[in-house]
Design a protein with these regions (language model features):
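Short acidic-glycine-tyrosine-enriched beta hairpin
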Residues: 50-67
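Double-stranded beta-helix
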Residues: 3, 9-16, 82-98
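Ligand-binding loop in jelly-roll beta-barrel domains
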Residues: 66-90
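Short hydrophobic/aromatic-rich beta-strand segments that constitute the beta-sheet cores
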Residues: 45-47, 82
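N-terminal first-folded block
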Residues: 2-32
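Short, conserved beta-strand element in jelly-roll/cupin
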Residues: 30-45
Length: 98
């Protein structure tokens, strides 16, 4: 199994610098998968349709499917980054990109 490699990534955001665009409903474009990684702290990832929520922690990254409308709610101090893929990323529990 070949693990997809991200083609890009967001800046690293904290609870202060997280842009309003990510705090409000938005979505990735067609063909783009997101992988939300927490470096510290946690966020609530809220999907709109179908409605669901996921707690994202440093041990539990979250996959964001193409065109899935969602937003992020910081739960206290945190740092996070989103990686972007052209195919569904693999969740490897012990992956450490350094």
């Amino acid at each position: 199994v070949v693990t997809p490699v991200p083609y890009g990534a967001s800046p690293i955001f904290d609870e202060q610098s997280l842009p309003d665009a990510l705090r409000n409903d938005h979505r990735t474009k067609a063909g783009t998968w997101g992988l939300l990684r927490m470096l510290e702290g946690e966020v609530r990832l809220v999907f709109v349709d179908p409605p669901s929520e996921q707690l994202v922690t440093p041990d539990r990254p979250a996959i964001i499917p193409p065109q899935a409308t969602h937003h992020v709610v910081p739960l206290g101090p945190m740092t996070m980054q989103v990686e972007f893929y052209r195919e569904r990323p693999e969740l490897v529990e012990d992956a450490d990109r350094g």
